[in-house]
């Protein structure tokens, strides 16, 4: 679901970045207000970004030789609220693009709009509706399923309208596949396998939190994190250790191909993709020079967690928080 650079036109990227910016700005404002009431939310933002980052490393195979992954957007909304979740997801997507080349730099606004805005807010609204009817578990299941599929549908539409932008000869400049291809390709995968994976991770982690500390779940009036940070660390450790399992799924997710991969699939690569913006991430595809793939995957995960931890500490320090961690 991470759209690479040059698959969307610069105009599309700009429009989606402009659409995402005010929501991210509002999320920052809301989180600042929450931090004034509860300083312990600061480390939780880093934990939430880490959790989503790790979930997105678990690729699963899908028919057609491609892969898919969970995002954790609705899960984070349930744990720390939709605004904090949106901010944490945005930071995770930014780090993925800059450091690991997962998702484009120019397409960052689109990826934030799909995965860090539409998914957590829509999914949380569904969850909250069921919660108010005393069907919280159903809300977790349905909300996470709806959330990831809304994000997938938006991605499919954004990619599918790109063939409109073409050369005088009618050759697409950017993503070459129209809506008749992108919507079925994305939605069949996410309505079945990816949706099930998202629901599974969301439910398992939700049940873990519910059992060890039900008071830690977010409510519109409070977000309790004092003991949550300690408990969720165990989940992060397990996910880091298991992260190389994401390498078992071969192939690239639909719409996330590099120009080289696309060249193997098509006779003519669109000019906008072949000659477009190029950015070489330091640890592209979660590989570390001099290490084997599995070790590189684990080290990439640890690197991300350390960065998110430092960011959490910085936010806490800037807000004058003095939180003691056992």
Residue ranges: model-predicted function:
Residues 1, 280-315:
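Individual transmembrane alpha-helix segments
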Residues 1-13, 36-40, 65-67, 106-110, ...:
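Interfacial loop-to-helix junctions that mark the boundaries of transmembrane helices
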Residues 115-156:
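Short helix-perturbing small/polar motifs within transmembrane alpha-helices
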């Amino acid at each position: 679901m991470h759209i690479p650079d040059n698959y969307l036109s610069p105009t599309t990227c700009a429009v989606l970045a402009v659409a995402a910016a005010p929501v991210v700005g509002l999320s920052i404002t809301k989180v600042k207000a929450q931090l004034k009431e509860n300083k312990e939310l600061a480390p939780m933002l880093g934990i939430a970004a880490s959790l989503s980052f790790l979930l997105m490393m678990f690729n699963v195979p899908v028919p057609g030789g491609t892969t898919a992954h969970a995002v954790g957007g609705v899960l984070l909304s349930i744990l720390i609220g939709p605004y904090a979740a949106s901010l944490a997801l945005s930071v995770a997507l930014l780090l993925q693009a800059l450091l690991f080349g997962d998702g484009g730099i120019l397409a960052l606004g689109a990826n934030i709009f799909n995965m860090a805005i539409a998914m957590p807010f829509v999914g949380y609204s569904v969850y909250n509706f069921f919660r108010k009817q005393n069907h919280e578990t159903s809300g977790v299941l349905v909300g996470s399923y709806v959330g990831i599929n809304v994000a997938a549908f938006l991605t499919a539409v954004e990619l599918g309208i790109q063939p409109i932008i073409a050369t005088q000869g009618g050759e697409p400049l950017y993503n070459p596949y129209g809506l008749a291809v992108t919507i079925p390709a994305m939605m069949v995968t996410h309505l079945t396998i990816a949706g099930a994976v998202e629901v599974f991770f969301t439910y398992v982690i939700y049940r873990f939190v519910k059992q060890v500390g039900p008071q830690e779940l977010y409510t519109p009036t409070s977000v309790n994190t004092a003991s949550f940070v300690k408990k969720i660390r165990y989940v992060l450790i397990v996910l880091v250790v298991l992260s190389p399992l994401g390498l078992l799924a071969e192939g690239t997710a639909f719409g996330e191909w590099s120009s080289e991969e696309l060249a193997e699939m098509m006779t003519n690569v669109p000019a906008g993709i072949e000659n477009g913006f190029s950015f070489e991430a330091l640890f592209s595809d979660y590989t570390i020079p001099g290490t084997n793939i599995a070790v590189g995957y684990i080290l990439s995960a640890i690197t991300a967690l350390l960065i998110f931890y430092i960011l959490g500490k910085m936010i806490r320090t800037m807000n004058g928080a003095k939180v003691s961690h056992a």
